[in-house]
Amino acid sequence: MLLVRQLFGASANSWARALIIFVLAWIGLVYVFVVKLTNTQGQQAAGESELNARRISQALQMLEHTRQRNEELKQLIDELMSDQLDKQSAMKLVQRLENDALNPKLAPEVAGPEPESMFESAPADLRGWNNVAEGAPNDLEAGVPDHGEFEPSLEYEFTRRRIQTNIGEIWNFFSSELGKVRKAVAAGHASADLEESINQVLLQGAEHKRSLLSDMERMRQSDGYEAWRHKEARDLSDLVQRRLHHLQNPSDCQNARKLVCKLNKGCGYGCQLHHVVYCFIVAYATERTLILKSRGWRYHKGGWEEVFQPVSNSCHDAGTANTYNWPGKPNTQVLVLPIIDSLMPRPPYLPLAVPEDLAPRLKRLHGDPIVWWVGQFLKYLLRPQPTTRDFLTSGMRNLGWERPIVGVHVRRTDKVGTEAACHSVEEYMTYVEDYYRTLEVNGSTVARRIFLASDDAQVIEEARRKYPQYQIIGDPEVARMASVSTRYTDTALNGIILDIHLLSMSDHLVCTFSSQVCRVAYEIMQTMYPDAAHRFKSLDDIYYYGGQNAHNRRVVIAHKPRTHEDLQLRVGDLVSVAGNHWDGNSKGKNTRTNQGGLFPSFKVEEKVDTAKLPLYAGI
């Protein structure tokens, strides 16, 4: 077929040669038909009537197929003679002939399945609002599946997500710069007409951005890959959950290698969850059964197992073997792990790394693979006990929780002034309103509803007073119990568990990623959708994992410094990212030049770090 393609040049003289190729293709199809018909006639009739009937039917279908090709060739000749054939129509015919040659199973004698039938196990609700139902264990290997006609390529999925990210980045830039000009105008440095013009640019720019994002969402829903995304997400999640279950339930607990993790890290609930996830990642990487020491837990003295299901069904303690501190040796039976801040040496599989064997599939499926990876450990760890599940169900019912809904988390008290700046309620609600206007870009009207969680009860009361047009779901009593003086109680624990649960089930998150509670909710959210990487707005930090290894991004567009604050970037450079200023620029350090500074966010792409981890063969 390469020869056929080469014959289609700009020269009109190539049509005669092209015609010869098409006639040869037609002769080949007739030859196949004759051979099949001859073979059919050579069979003995006795006892084979049914088989012969099927073969005759196949031959007739092939004859019809050949007749259609004959008609197309005849039409082609007529168009050639009248100089009415353009190159595009010719190439379409070439493509059809090529597909028939490369995919004989798609010929009329065997009708292929409809695209939908290939994904019978996909959930009916493809909007991503509901969690994917648990399916039966799948034996799909962790390697990259051959993506065929009904699966997207890595490049397609990567490009789609990159466009979505950069739509937001370009708006960050223009809104920030025009906002500065507007402030200058308001201060009396320009006329009122100019101020009004700038306001119109901002308003129309925001509407244009919402339209683009709405189009992107429509493209995702209609590109034909949504069923694949749900199936692939379910298959990958099932694979990881089976591996974790296998790791945590060894056949011989007494002689199994173990990793001891002590729950009582001196920090809040979200921080402690991340501590347990870090322990679990190390256990997974070293093929050690995780032993969680939780008796006397500051949030619940009875321990983890009274709130969530045990991390193991059969192996609950370290046994009588001697224990050794990290790093120990490969044959050390019981290893005690310190907190991530004091871990030395630091292994390469710490966040932000994902398993090498899963990485090709994850990069194709998800916009931020490390968040998905962390979410899988939380999915296993946070399986509720029946009493906890009943509490969550009744809590949702009592609050009147329903979709669509935006989850808003406002962190105050001990974080403000030390680890994070104070953000007004208006800042959060600006992005909430923008989300709902994006939903309404097609002219529909959507009920405005938010779930508001905070450690300051006054925040909920303030929001209800300032935004009466919103249905604001939240419990001021839970917020009061989350204050520093009362947060380490059973009541406060129930409140924070409910808050995180409802935040994670929201359609969109508005919060500060400096808060571990917000990051935990975002991580759990990834288990609710095939890809929820873009379902958030952080008012401060980008996503990070406390104690992580370097967060690098790769330069894809060169950058010449515009000011003394800018970095010089070459294509291929790695930039260690410190944060996003949400004005179109990010801050980081060029690892090639070792210089720090600002750079346009759209000129880099995420570099997904991988680490060689156990394959858990046969699981």
UniProtKB/Swiss-Prot annotation:
Keyword Chloroplast included in the entry's annotation: no
Cofactor dependency: Mn(2+); Mg(2+)
Keywords, alphabetical: Disulfide bond, Glycosyltransferase, Golgi apparatus, Magnesium, Manganese, Membrane, Metal-binding, SH3 domain, Signal-anchor, Transferase, Transmembrane, Transmembrane helix
Top-level EC class as recorded in UniProt: transferase
Short motif SH3-binding, span: 345-351
GO cellular component: Golgi cisterna membrane
GO molecular function, one term: glycoprotein 6-alpha-L-fucosyltransferase activity
Reaction catalysed by this enzyme: N(4)-{beta-D-GlcNAc-(1->2)-alpha-D-Man-(1->3)-[beta-D-GlcNAc-(1->2)-alpha-D-Man-(1->6)]-beta-D-Man-(1->4)-beta-D-GlcNAc-(1->4)-beta-D-GlcNAc}-L-asparaginyl-[protein] + GDP-beta-L-fucose = an N(4)-{beta-D-GlcNAc-(1->2)-alpha-D-Man-(1->3)-[beta-D-GlcNAc-(1->2)-alpha-D-Man-(1->6)]-beta-D-Man-(1->4)-beta-D-GlcNAc-(1->4)-[alpha-L-Fuc-(1->6)]-beta-D-GlcNAc}-L-asparaginyl-[protein] + GDP + H(+)
Compartments where located: Golgi apparatus, Golgi stack membrane
InterPro entries: Fut8, Fut8_N_cat, Fut8_SH3, GT23_dom, SH3-like_dom_sf, SH3_domain
Cytoplasmic side stretches: 1-17
Domain GT23 as annotated: residue spans: 255-539
Pathway(s) per entry: Protein modification; protein glycosylation
Parts of the chain that traverse the membrane: 18-38
Main localization, broad class: Golgi
Function per UniProt: Catalyzes the addition of fucose in alpha 1-6 linkage to the first GlcNAc residue, next to the peptide chains in N-glycans. The addition is prevented if the GlcNAc residue is already fucosylated.
Similarity-based family: Belongs to the glycosyltransferase 23 family.
Name of protein: Alpha-(1,6)-fucosyltransferase
Organism: Drosophila melanogaster
Gene: FucT6
